[in-house]
Amino acid sequence: MIVFLPQSQTAIISNLLGPLFPHFPNLNTLRGDRYRFVEPYLETVQKLRDLQVHVIIPGRHLPIQGAELIDGCLARLHGAVDYVHRETLAGMNAGIDVHTLMNDIVLPSELRVGQGYGKVAWGVRTIWETYMGWFHLQSSTELYAAQPIEAMGELVQLIGVDVACERAESLVSTDQPVLAVHIAEAILLVEPNHERAAAVMVAAHQALLAQGGDVSFWESGWLRHQIIKWSR
């Protein structure tokens, strides 16, 4: 909801566009929430532009002042979200899987906005799942309750936890911390008290923070929590 005060061209928007302005929206929060649809969001941003506001009073932080500044921010925000929406749909229609799209879709420099709240990659995934649902069309296993980590655990037992842990450590050292986490989690499924695997979890999450995971406060909070959890 927008409360508009025409005498001063002021819009009171609370957290309508998120707590950080102008940052990419969180179309689905890490804390758990219903998916937020792109089209109503874009309509809201355009409505604010049409009002030609001079002051925005958000739900957090100080008021934002200046008609030219506000319109420029809103224009860029609208363009950024619209771009990600269109690029995601184009990728879906081309048969590209969601994880590839999450990796490949980036904002052009002229549409760059902050990602301290929502992230482009998360927006891509939410848009994909809003249209397609939870079935990613990649594997029959998606239709059943068995988790991928269970299969990874079987492979860890087959090759041995020490060999698997060496590979995970190598992945951390070669800047592939996400893959290292996958393997370390499988090891810990087989041997919950495996100290080297726990150390890999700490190192991998530290690496993710260093690689930009500290930009989004949602992501940095989760990564730091995991570091504390696995520090033994």
What are the roles of these predicted feature ranges?
Residues M1-A94:
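Metallo-beta-lactamase
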